C-alpha cells in the first residue's frame, strides 16, 4: 500500500488483469512462484480501445433501444486484415464496433433516471496512434488531441446512427475515452480493454 502496509493472503483473485497483477501488484518472487513471470513473456498486451459514452434525453422505450448488444462487422469480413489496415491507417474502416444499451437492460433504470438513456460504443484502437500524447495529463492533452477525439467521435456516431438512426436527435452528452484514458484510470499500460 502507499503507506507501506503489506497485505497478504493464501489465494489472490485479481480483476486487474494478469499483466498488471504480476508486474505491479505481486512481488517478483510471488509472480515467479505463481508461474506468471515466464508466462507473461509469451503474452502480448490485449487490444487498446476507444469507448464512446453517450447520454440521451429520452427513455429507452421512446428510443426503442434494444436489450441486446450489437456487434457490427464490415461486409468485407477478414478481422485480421481489417485490424491490420486500421492499425496502419487510422482513417480506415473500424474493424469492429460493439454497441451496448445499459439503460435498456437495467429494469430499475427508468425509475432511477426518468427520461434519460445511455449507450456505449466501443472499438479497437492501436495504442501507437496516441503515443504523441503519452506524457500529457488527462484533460490537458491539447488541441490536436481534442481534434483527433472529435474526428473519431463523429465516425463512431456515424456507425451508431446507421444502426439506430432514431437516436440522433436525442443526444445530450457525448464523451470519448481513448487508450490514454484507460491507462490513466485503470493503469493498463497500453490502454487495453
What are these regions (language model features)?
Residues 75, 104, 126, 176-178:
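Residues that form or immediately flank small-molecule/cofactor binding pockets and catalytic motifs
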Residues 19-24, 55-57, 113-155:
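Conserved FAD/dinucleotide-binding core of flavoprotein oxidoreductases
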Residues 27-29, 136, 177:
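Short Gly/aromatic-enriched secondary-structure transition segments
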Residues 1-112:
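Mid-domain catalytic core of redox enzymes
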Residues 57, 61, 106, 128, ...:
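Short secondary-structure junctions and interdomain/linker hinges
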Residues 81-82, 102, 116, 128, ...:
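Flavin (FAD/FMN)-binding glycine-rich loop and adjacent Rossmann-like elements that form
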Residues 94-98, 158, 162-193:
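A glycine-rich dinucleotide-binding beta-alpha-beta segment and adjacent secondary-structure elements
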Amino acid at each position: 500500500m502507499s503507506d507501506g502496509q503489506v497485505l497478504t493472503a493464501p489465494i489472490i483473485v485479481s480483476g486487474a488483469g494478469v499483466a498488471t497483477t504480476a508486474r505491479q501488484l505481486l512481488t517478483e518472487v510471488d509472480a515467479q512462484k505463481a508461474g506468471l513471470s515466464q508466462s507473461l513473456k509469451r503474452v502480448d498486451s490485449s487490444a487498446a480501445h476507444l469507448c464512446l459514452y453517450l447520454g440521451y434525453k429520452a427513455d429507452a422505450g421512446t428510443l426503442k433501444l434494444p436489450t441486446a448488444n450489437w456487434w457490427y462487422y464490415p461486409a468485407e469480413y477478414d478481422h485480421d486484415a481489417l485490424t491490420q489496415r486500421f492499425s496502419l491507417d487510422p482513417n480506415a474502416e473500424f474493424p469492429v464496433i460493439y454497441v451496448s444499451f445499459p439503460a435498456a437492460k437495467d429494469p430499475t433504470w427508468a425509475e432511477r433516471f426518468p427520461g434519460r438513456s445511455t449507450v456505449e460504443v466501443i472499438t479497437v484502437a492501436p495504442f501507437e496512434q496516441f503515443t504523441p500524447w503519452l506524457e500529457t495529463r488527462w484533460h490537458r492533452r491539447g488541441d490536436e488531441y481534442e481534434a483527433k477525439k472529435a474526428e473519431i467521435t463523429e465516425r463512431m456516431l456515424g456507425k451508431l446512427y446507421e444502426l439506430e438512426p432514431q437516436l440522433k436527435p436525442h443526444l445530450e452528452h457525448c464523451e470519448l475515452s481513448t487508450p490514454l484514458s484507460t491507462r490513466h484510470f485503470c493503469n493498463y499500460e497500453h490502454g487495453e480493454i
